[in-house]
């Protein structure tokens, strides 16, 4: 009996001692946390996460670019999104040493930065120094699309992307080039035949799958994870642009062939119309941008851009498309204040809305609103004299950026499908006689407006 009691007592003492030891460890841990802050490590003075491969690669890249006065800025979507969500914390961290690596130490393959090429003064020297610092770098180039319209310069090549690897982490440096519409453009990252396709997992890159266009961002300096760097002043605005940045060029080669086959109209009247149409489009683009209303080139204006990289001189108007969900009631007032009075308003927001504004010297701005169905999109038309309604069907499309008459504007990415819906397979042949009620292959009758609604749906000014 006494032996059993001794065993019980021994077990109880062991259990009590273990519990007390665990309590001491728990207390010690929380005492240190309270004393040194929530981001402290077990060894006083160490910083959590700063030994990661990712952070060391970014630090070395920042040291490299700073020493060479290369004004790079962070564009990595994942990190910018994290910064944007914790912006106050990042601003506060800029005032003192970082105790924990919260952004650049997260495991990933790449970190993306960008620079504006016209600010880069020593590209070749930078490349050599990067390799001396231990980076393995790959550079991609391509012909400068800004010179495609100039035969003698069309072969000039410009840098598009650098991918610099340090051990297992890579820095993707996207080279932005200025375009005449006062925006920034980057090219497609296309590997040439001799390049190592296993250099990094290229498919995981967040930029370079296609060319992209961005508004020129205002930048600010911050300290992130102990590293000083530039980021967009409005990270949220930049992040909104990323998934919608795809850019397609005007087809200069095909346009030259078209203008050789169909001699361009260079009469005084044609040149005056092009000038006025360009001014009208620039004014419309500014007005809609100020309203935050996205639009795209539609109908004859879209055809002119795609077929001949210019304005069709016999079209006599400028055509734009807007998704009906982007309609804002103050559109009419905004155009009137911009000096474009309303010429007519057909339809209503719920059905077949169309607005037309009078520009200078009889150049008209037509805005067609597009409605979405299960498998197609459509815009409406109204005959003022009879009240007849028409519907123009289009396959669904997405929007890409392009440059047209020195403006960054949207066009349907699926441009050929869009144009063929409106003009048929023979869109390459100029047609000067056009009946909007019967010529388009995608038009169909859509009923008639009740006379009781005419005052609302047929407004002429």
UniProtKB/Swiss-Prot annotation:
A biological-process GO annotation: negative regulation of JNK cascade
InterPro entries (UniProt xref): FKTN-rel (IPR009644), FKTN_N (IPR045587), LicD/FKTN/FKRP_NTP_transf (IPR007074)
EC number, UniProt record: 2.7.8.-
Topology term for the membrane: Single-pass type II membrane protein
Signal peptide segment: none
Lineage of the species this protein comes from: Eukaryota, Metazoa, Chordata, Craniata, Vertebrata
Pathway annotation: Protein modification; protein glycosylation
Presence of keyword Acetylation: no
Sorted UniProt keywords: Cytoplasm, Endoplasmic reticulum, Glycoprotein, Golgi apparatus, Membrane, Nucleus, Signal-anchor, Transferase, Transmembrane, Transmembrane helix
Region listing for Required and sufficient for interaction with POMGNT1, in residue ranges: 6-27
Tissues where this protein is expressed: Expressed in the retina, with highest levels found in the inner segments of photoreceptors and the outer plexiform layer (at protein level). Expressed at lower levels in the inner and outer nuclear layers, the inner plexiform layers, and the ganglion cell layers of the retina (at protein level). Expressed in the heart, brain, spleen, lung, liver, skeletal muscle, kidney and testis.
Main location: Golgi
Organism: Mus musculus (Mouse)
Catalytic reaction equation(s): 3-O-[beta-D-GalNAc-(1->3)-beta-D-GlcNAc-(1->4)-(O-6-P-alpha-D-Man)]-Thr-[protein] + CDP-L-ribitol = 3-O-[Rib-ol-P-3-beta-D-GalNAc-(1->3)-beta-D-GlcNAc-(1->4)-(O-6-P-alpha-D-Man)]-Thr-[protein] + CMP + H(+)
Name of the molecule in the record: Ribitol-5-phosphate transferase FKTN
Disulfide bonds, paired cysteine numbers: none
One term of GO molecular function: phosphotransferase activity, for other substituted phosphate groups
Family the entry assigns: Belongs to the LicD transferase family.
UniProt subcellular location: Golgi apparatus membrane; Cytoplasm; Nucleus; Endoplasmic reticulum
Cytoplasmic-facing ranges: 1-7
Biological role stated in the UniProt entry: Catalyzes the transfer of CDP-ribitol to the distal N-acetylgalactosamine of the phosphorylated O-mannosyl trisaccharide (N-acetylgalactosamine-beta-3-N-acetylglucosamine-beta-4-(phosphate-6-)mannose), a carbohydrate structure present in alpha-dystroglycan (DAG1). This constitutes the first step in the formation of the ribitol 5-phosphate tandem repeat which links the phosphorylated O-mannosyl trisaccharide to the ligand binding moiety composed of repeats of 3-xylosyl-alpha-1,3-glucuronic acid-beta-1. Required for normal location of POMGNT1 in Golgi membranes, and for normal POMGNT1 activity.
Ranges in the topological domain labelled Lumenal: 29-461
Assembly with partners or alone: Forms a complex composed of FKTN/fukutin, FKRP and RXYLT1/TMEM5. Interacts (via transmembrane domain) with POMGNT1; the interaction is direct and is required for normal POMGNT1 location in Golgi membranes.
Null allele phenotype: Embryonic lethality. However, when human FCMD disease-causing retrotransposon is introduced into the mouse fukutin gene, alpha-dystroglycan/DAG1 is hypoglycosylated in muscles as is seen in FCMD (congenital muscular dystrophy Fukuyama) patients. Transfer of normal fukutin gene into these knockin mice restores glycosylation of alpha-dystroglycan. Conditional knockout in muscle results in near absence of glycosylated dystroglycan within 18 days of gene deletion.
GO cellular component: cis-Golgi network; endoplasmic reticulum; Golgi apparatus; Golgi membrane; nucleus
Residues modified by glycosylation: 92
Transmembrane segments: 8-28
């Amino acid at each position: 009996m006494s032996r059993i009691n001794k065993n019980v007592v021994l077990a109880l003492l062991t259990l009590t001692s273990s519990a007390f030891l665990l309590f001491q460890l728990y207390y010690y841990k929380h005492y240190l946390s309270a004393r040194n802050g929530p981001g402290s490590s077990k060894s006083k003075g160490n910083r959590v996460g700063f030994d990661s491969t990712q952070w060391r690669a970014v630090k070395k890249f920042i040291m490299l670019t700073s020493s060479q006065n290369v004004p790079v800025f962070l564009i990595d979507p994942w990190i910018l999104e994290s910064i944007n969500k914790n912006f106050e914390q990042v601003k506060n961290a800029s005032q003192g040493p970082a105790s924990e690596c919260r952004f650049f130490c997260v495991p990933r393959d790449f970190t993306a930065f960008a620079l504006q090429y016209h600010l880069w003064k020593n590209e070749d020297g930078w490349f050599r120094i990067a390799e001396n610092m231990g980076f393995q770098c790959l550079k991609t180039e391509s012909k400068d699309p800004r010179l495609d319209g100039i035969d003698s310069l069309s072969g000039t090549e410009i840098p598009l992307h650098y991918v610099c690897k340090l051990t297992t982490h890579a820095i993707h440096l996207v080279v932005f080039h200025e375009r005449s519409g006062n925006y920034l453009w980057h090219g497609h990252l296309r590997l040439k035949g001799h390049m190592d396709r296993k250099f990094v997992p290229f498919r995981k890159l967040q930029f370079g799958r296609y060319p992209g266009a961005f508004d020129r961002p205002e930048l600010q300096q911050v300290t992130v994870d102990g590293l000083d760097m530039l980021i967009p002043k409005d990270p949220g605005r930049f992040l909104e642009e990323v998934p919608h940045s795809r850019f397609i060029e005007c087809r200069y080669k095909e346009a030259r062939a078209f203008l050789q086959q169909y001699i361009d109209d260079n009469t005084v009247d044609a040149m005056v119309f092009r000038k006025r149409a360009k001014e009208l489009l620039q004014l419309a683009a500014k007005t809609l941008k100020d309203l935050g209303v996205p639009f795209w080139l539609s109908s004859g204006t879209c055809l002119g851009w795609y077929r001949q990289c210019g304005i069709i001189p016999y079209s006599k108007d400028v055509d734009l498309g807007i998704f009906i969900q982007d309609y804002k009631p103050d559109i009419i007032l905004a155009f009137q204040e911009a000096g474009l009075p309303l010429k007519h308003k057909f339809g209503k927001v719920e059905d077949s809305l169309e607005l037309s504004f009078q520009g200078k010297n009889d150049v008209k701005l037509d805005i067609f609103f597009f409605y979405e169905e299960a498998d197609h999109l459509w815009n409406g038309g109204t005959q003022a004299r009879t009240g007849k309604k028409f519907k123009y069907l289009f396959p669904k499309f997405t929007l890409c950026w392009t440059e047209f008459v020195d403006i960054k504007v949207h066009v349907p990415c699926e441009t050929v499908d869009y144009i063929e819906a409106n003009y048929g397979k023979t869109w390459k042949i100029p047609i000067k006689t056009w009946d909007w009620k019967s010529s388009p292959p995608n038009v169909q009758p859509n009923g008639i407006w009740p006379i009781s609604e005419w005052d609302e749906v047929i407004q002429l000014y």
